[in-house]
């Protein structure tokens, strides 16, 4: 009888562990659930007419050029003209990375038209850094969809050989090396390509070999589920019934605009169907709606922060998180110091065995306790 009771207690504990693992703060259940989204997609819509997008004032058309391979990861940072401190903090931290895990990384800043007195400053900044993409629309939160589409269209026109594009914001810290590793695991280059960096000639040959290969469709981010439009006119997230009628129900699942990854094939698919989607001012929702119309569902990744801010922590920022939101310029550079050596070279992040065992779960608890 005591043995039978012991077995019952053991089974109950195991059941609680399974439930906690799947549906608790680890986020594993969310990732597994997102895999079912593809089976719920409607038939893809037919391509729409070409998008009518604002012209580029600063095109930086040769940003992806050079004698080496094209970017494995191209990062588009949405920023405002007056956010110079944020851009400089990124340039001095994770945005300075040009290679991760042996692959080229490129970071560019997206913005619209500034106030007249900022025009000269922006031109000087662009000439100095050559990392600015500017389109001819008034820069505002309600124009984020225009800004993002202008960036994706630039990628398709000037950098179609990039494999993956991360769209993010200027208050987000990005763990570039771990993000590249994540993308390699999810469908990046072959192991042979990864190891080919040992000799320049071999690297070039292998990149050429993979140049014509199609990149698998990927739309990766912190997925929001069953979000309904905000009808409050004063809210910057306001969506009118004309744009999204009530009988349409909630928005389809979409990835948080603070940081999502699109493969180049996903970028091209979204651009083909975007003109048939309602012109929503919420850029991340618009991308999700367009992706759904194209037959593409988002994949949930718990390592991407979404709207969550994580306190500075060497193990979380260096190993387990791919992004952290609401990071000001000072915190951006402090986070960089945590995961970098004294000479600016990135060192292996320090995690104790317990920190490593708890992984992302520990980081989420830290964020929860500090909120």
UniProtKB/Swiss-Prot annotation:
Keyword Phosphoprotein included in the entry's annotation: no
InterPro entries xref list: Glyco_trans_31 (IPR002659)
Compartment(s) of residence: Golgi apparatus membrane
UniProt-annotated glycosylation sites, renumbered to this chain: 143
Membrane topology of the entry: Single-pass type II membrane protein
Transmembrane region(s): 5-25
Cited Pfam families: Galactosyl_T
Impact upon substituting residue 248 to R: In strain: pgn2
A Gene Ontology molecular function term of the record: ganglioside galactosyltransferase activity
Catalytic activity as recorded in UniProt: a ganglioside GM2 (d18:1(4E)) + UDP-alpha-D-galactose = a ganglioside GM1 (d18:1(4E)) + UDP + H(+); a ganglioside GM2 + UDP-alpha-D-galactose = a ganglioside GM1 + UDP + H(+); a ganglioside GD2 (d18:1(4E)) + UDP-alpha-D-galactose = a ganglioside GD1b (d18:1(4E)) + UDP + H(+); a ganglioside GA2 (d18:1(4E)) + UDP-alpha-D-galactose = a ganglioside GA1 (d18:1(4E)) + UDP + H(+)
GO cellular component labels: Golgi membrane
Gene Ontology biological-process entries: ganglioside biosynthetic process; protein glycosylation
Residue intervals on the Cytoplasmic side: 1-4
Enzyme Commission number(s) of this protein: 2.4.1.62
Pathway note: Protein modification; protein glycosylation
Top class in the EC scheme: transferase
Annotated function: Involved in GM1/GD1B/GA1 ganglioside biosynthesis.
Protein name per UniProt: Beta-1,3-galactosyltransferase 4
Organism: Mus musculus
Taxonomy of the source species: Eukaryota, Metazoa, Chordata, Craniata, Vertebrata
